[in-house]
């Protein structure tokens, strides 16, 4: 199937929570994380804010239907990936990689020095996926105050402390 990556538009925002919910279904394969499939997702206002800033990209199928997205936010001289989700029926098609490539292009053009994210350390489609694309796992000290605050918040909402990690791709 043919896919296209483009900058997200305001009218896309209402469709994005359903994509994130679909992507979350993959966590049902991992009994200890199955609860994530039923957890809340980012709201429309979150997406609209990042779309307005120009740091939100969409993967769409040949019919122009949204099937994935990457939402990012500029934090000083880094671009932080807040969410990368691909609808379950469209996973394993290289869309996550293509969305990340678009974010890297944007980061270079915006004079960012790195991309950052937090993710699950041992879930195959999380940290191992990002590591294959050049992201490095950070120690607690290397993560810095901003990423440590995100990891702390993730613990507060129910993630086990040792299950999450911060990663960085230096440009």
From Swiss-Prot:
Instruction: List the Pfam families.
Output: Acetyltransf_1 (PF00583)
Q: Which molecular function GO terms apply here?
A: acyltransferase activity, transferring groups other than amino-acyl groups
Does the entry feature the keyword Acyltransferase, yes or no? yes
| CDD domains according to UniProt | NAT_SF
Establish whether keyword Transferase is in the entry. yes
- PROSITE patterns for the chain: GNAT
EC number(s) per UniProt? Answer: 2.3.1.-
- Report what the protein is called: Acetyltransferase PA2271
Gene source species: Pseudomonas aeruginosa (strain ATCC 15692 / DSM 22644 / CIP 104116 / JCM 14847 / LMG 12228 / 1C / PRS 101 / PAO1)
């Amino acid at each position: 199937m043919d896919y296209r990556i483009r900058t997200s538009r305001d009218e896309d925002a209402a469709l994005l929570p359903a994509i994130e919910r679909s992507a979350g279904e993959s966590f049902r394969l991992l009994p200890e994380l199955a609860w994530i499939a039923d957890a809340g997702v980012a709201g429309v206002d979150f997406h609209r804010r990042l779309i307005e800033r120009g740091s939100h990209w969409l993967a769409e199928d040949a019919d122009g239907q949204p099937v994935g997205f990457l939402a990012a936010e500029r934090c000083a001289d880094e671009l932080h990936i807040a969410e990368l989700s691909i609808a379950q029926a469209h996973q394993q098609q290289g869309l996550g990689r293509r969305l990340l490539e678009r974010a890297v292009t944007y980061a270079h053009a915006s004079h960012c020095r790195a991309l950052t994210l937090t993710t699950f350390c041992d879930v195959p489609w999380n940290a191992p996926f990002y590591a294959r694309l050049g992201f490095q796992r950070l120690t607690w000290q290397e993560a810095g105050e901003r990423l440590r605050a995100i990891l702390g918040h993730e613990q507060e909402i129910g993630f086990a402390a040792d299950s999450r990690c911060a990663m960085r791709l230096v440009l």
